[in-house]
Amino acid sequence: MRKPLVGINMKNYINTRAQTSEWLEATIPLLENFSDVDTFIFPSMGTLETTANLLAGTSFGFGPQNMAPEKSGPLTGEFSVESIIDLNANYVEIGHAERKNLFHEKTSEIAKKIKLALDEKITPVVCVGEEVHANDTNELKNALKKQIEALFQTINLAQWENVVLAYEPEWAIGKASSAETNYIESAHQALREIIRELGGDETLVRIIYGGSVSKENAAEIVRQKNVDGLFVGRFGHKPQNFADIVSIVSKTKG
């Protein structure tokens, strides 16, 4: 059985060591009774060491919001997987829509990052999702299949179980409301079908939903069979809000 998972991406909203410390010190105690749910945070890149120190000895996972496609070399401004390992981080966010749209990351580069993370035993949280709302399930599956085939063509089949897919339809990111619940379930089901068609064991892969997640929609979303958890954005900037989401997932999936 796949263990439920809730994560939060701080982007560049909570950027100082003091702010990050305040958030973590408030949040960690609120999660003590939810051992049936895995949690992780992608803090602002400048606060990774602070995060590592505060989360040492806890089950709260963390990692950077991006990483270089190579271990080392002339890659100015990138973040090496060697640094991730050195921090004892266990997750890395890869392929977020903002990385592709603002920084023009290519699919081939993202695929290399995924493979490198898996080879180095770091769990990649790989963001996938269509740019516009699909008209039907076939159109939705075809859009997702094109992405998955391009991103995962170089991984070993056994590595699939170490992948986390974050389904984030680009048209729902940062909006007032999430995608429709039945649409979300259709996308998650399609992703499992695609993994199976590529030879992976879809029953082992955790797929979480991200895009305007809140207390109001969390329970209905994670009640869906193929949804394993949630990827929270600005709603989780208040520690109690993040803890409430974890609680909802625990009650619904735990």
Swiss-Prot record:
EC number: 5.3.1.1
Top-rank lineage group of the source organism: Bacteria
SUPFAM superfamilies hit by this protein: Triosephosphate isomerase (TIM) (SSF51351)
Main location: cytoplasm
InterPro entries reported for this sequence: Aldolase_TIM (IPR013785), TIM_sf (IPR035990), Triosephosphate_isomerase (IPR000652), Triosephosphate_isomerase_AS (IPR020861)
Keyword hit for Zinc: no
Residues reported in the UniProt entry to bind substrate: N9, M10, K11, G174, S212
GO biological-process terms attached to the record: gluconeogenesis; glyceraldehyde-3-phosphate biosynthetic process; glycerol catabolic process; glycolytic process
PROSITE patterns (alphabetical): TIM_1, TIM_2
One GO MF term attached to the UniProt entry: triose-phosphate isomerase activity
PANTHER family: TRIOSEPHOSPHATE ISOMERASE
Function: Involved in the glycerol metabolism. Catalyzes stereospecifically the conversion of dihydroxyacetone phosphate (DHAP) to D-glyceraldehyde-3-phosphate (G3P).
Complex and partners: Homodimer.
Protein name, as recorded: Triosephosphate isomerase 2
Species this protein is from: Listeria innocua serovar 6a (strain ATCC BAA-680 / CLIP 11262)
Gene designation: tpi-2
